[in-house]
Amino acid sequence: MLKSYPFIGLMGYAAGENPLSYPEVKYAMVLQLINAAAKLVDFVILDCSSNMANVFTPAAIEAGDLVIRILMPDLKGVNYLKAHQPLLVDGRFHYNEHLSLAGMARPFHALDEMGYIIGGWDGLLPYGKEIDRCATEGGMFQAIKYCNSRYTASLSKVLKALEQPEENEGSEEEEESADE
């Protein structure tokens, strides 16, 4: 739990830990962990590596109601995605439903060209020195004060996408009640 935000819980490696600090984790165990967490809280946010060989990444993508992919909008970021795309075509990963955001975007990035290669951007998270400083200082919850309008528009799109599954659940429940 975070002292300043007691409604937010975090889980991850402690200082000095790494994947080798623990016994090997199986895919099914990760899915169980995600499902257990989902029963405890309204939202489970999993910040995963983009490495599909890491057992948490494919499990999180499979279990996620909303998958947000943040790419550097340069050849390295786009080529990395294209190299992993064949691993994500399995229907359980719902690849075409992911939101793709251009992260750390700077004016010199060829956003249109990179977006064309991946099928378009759903949002833009421009680089900001102030945001970078908040991350370095461990104050990411303060960073929202420094986000420009393009950044906040992308965040709003994510929030709207998060609300959609709840709206769909409500309409499904109404349909079931009407059928009875």
Residue ranges of predicted features:
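Well-ordered beta-strand positions
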Residues: 43, 66, 120-123
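NTP-binding/hydrolysis catalytic cores, primarily Walker-type P-loop NTPases
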Residues: 137-180
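Beta-strand-loop-alpha "switch" segments that mediate conformational coupling across diverse proteins
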Residues: 103-145, 155
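P-loop/Walker A phosphate-binding loop and immediately adjacent motor/lid segment at beta-alpha junctions
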Residues: 24-31, 82-109, 143-145
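P-loop/Walker-type NTP enzyme "switch/lid" segment
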Residues: 1-39, 134-137
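Glycine-rich phosphate-binding loop used to anchor ATP phosphates in small-molecule kinases
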Residues: 40-51
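Conserved beta-strand segments of the P-loop GTPase G domain that flank and frequently precede/overlap
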Residues: 12-13, 45-47, 68-73, 99-104
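Inter-motif core of Ras-like GTPase G domains
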Residues: 55-74
